[in-house]
């Protein structure tokens, strides 16, 4: 099981196929998605990688967060998330995951927070039919009607579908096909809609219900950071030449 990535939703557009058909796609941007920490079986009881994405000013991070980012030698991140992985699929701390982590044609599962709709009635929130347009009904055409039973049980059961807050919940959409990747610009285009508004954070993982293509990189596609020693060695080699 490989790591996923933290991406940012840019919006929707369409891509034309060679046959002239157009596909509605959602464009996701993978930018500065780096490994911040590891979770190991000995220390934490499970194996995972903690990723960070986006940029945040140091003054807007607390002392504990600054220490965590300093140990990983990465810039402060706006979004953090963990992804469970196999023990042999750990990506080095500080490595930056790139858009070619996913290959064209593979399926992914995306997780995001849906757009909040505020307080909504039963017809909009749960697709209720409402009451009759006439024949004794006045004013309450869009109400949900009775919510309880008779004298027994004499109550409304918990989890009854009723008017209330709609949206702003975490939702996972499964089996979206990767249509295009652009490593230079850090873009991933997936077929279909992705939950959330433009600019929202999206967790992208390999689909659990589809087979991973053999050409998918393992443990992933990433760029290792340049250490001070490597930079100094390159400078020495250039001077010697």
From Swiss-Prot:
<dbReference type="GO" id="GO:0019843">
    <property type="term" value="F:rRNA binding"/>
</dbReference>
<dbReference type="InterPro" id="IPR009000">
    <property type="entry name" value="Transl_B-barrel_sf"/>
</dbReference>
<dbReference type="InterPro" id="IPR019927">
    <property type="entry name" value="Ribosomal_uL3_bac/org-type"/>
</dbReference>
<comment type="subunit">
    <text>Part of the 50S ribosomal subunit. Forms a cluster with proteins L14 and L19.</text>
</comment>
<dbReference type="InterPro" id="IPR000597">
    <property type="entry name" value="Ribosomal_uL3"/>
</dbReference>
<feature type="modified residue" description="N5-methylglutamine">
    <location>
        <position position="151"/>
    </location>
</feature>
<dbReference type="GO" id="GO:0006412">
    <property type="term" value="P:translation"/>
</dbReference>
<dbReference type="GO" id="GO:0022625">
    <property type="term" value="C:cytosolic large ribosomal subunit"/>
</dbReference>
<dbReference type="Pfam" id="PF00297">
    <property type="entry name" value="Ribosomal_L3"/>
</dbReference>
<feature type="region of interest" description="Disordered">
    <location>
        <begin position="140"/>
        <end position="168"/>
    </location>
</feature>
<keyword id="KW-0689">Ribosomal protein</keyword>
<comment type="similarity">
    <text>Belongs to the universal ribosomal protein uL3 family.</text>
</comment>
<keyword id="KW-0687">Ribonucleoprotein</keyword>
<keyword id="KW-0488">Methylation</keyword>
<dbReference type="InterPro" id="IPR019926">
    <property type="entry name" value="Ribosomal_uL3_CS"/>
</dbReference>
<protein>
    <recommendedName>
        <fullName>Large ribosomal subunit protein uL3</fullName>
    </recommendedName>
</protein>
<keyword id="KW-0699">rRNA-binding</keyword>
<comment type="function">
    <text>One of the primary rRNA binding proteins, it binds directly near the 3'-end of the 23S rRNA, where it nucleates assembly of the 50S subunit.</text>
</comment>
<keyword id="KW-0694">RNA-binding</keyword>
<dbReference type="GO" id="GO:0003735">
    <property type="term" value="F:structural constituent of ribosome"/>
</dbReference>
């Amino acid at each position: 099981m490989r790591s996923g990535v933290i991406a940012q939703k840019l919006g929707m557009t369409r891509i034309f196929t060679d046959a002239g058909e157009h596909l509605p796609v959602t464009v996701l941007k993978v930018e500065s998605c780096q490994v911040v920490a590891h979770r190991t079986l000995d220390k934490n009881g499970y194996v995972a990688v903690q990723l960070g994405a986006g940029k945040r000013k140091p003054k807007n991070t607390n002392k504990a967060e600054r220490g965590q980012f300093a140990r990983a030698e990465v810039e402060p991140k706006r979004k953090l998330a963990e992804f469970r992985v196999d023990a042999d699929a750990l990506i080095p701390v500080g490595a930056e995951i790139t858009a070619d982590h996913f290959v064209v044609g593979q399926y992914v599962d995306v997780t995001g927070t849906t757009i909040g709709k505020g307080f909504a009635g039963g017809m909009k929130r749960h697709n209720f039919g409402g009451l009759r347009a006439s024949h004794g009904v006045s004013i309450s055409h869009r109400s949900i009607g009775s919510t309880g039973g008779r004298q027994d049980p004499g109550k409304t059961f918990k989890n009854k579908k009723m008017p209330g807050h709609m949206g702003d919940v975490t939702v996972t959409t499964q089996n979206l096909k990767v249509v295009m990747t652009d490593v230079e610009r850090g873009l991933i285009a997936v077929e279909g809609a992705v939950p959330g508004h433009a600019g929202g954070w999206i967790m992208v993982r390999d689909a659990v219900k589809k087979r991973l293509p053999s050409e998918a990189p393992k443990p992933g596609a990433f760029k290792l950071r340049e250490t001070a020693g490597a930079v100094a060695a390159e400078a020495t080699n250039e001077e010697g030449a």
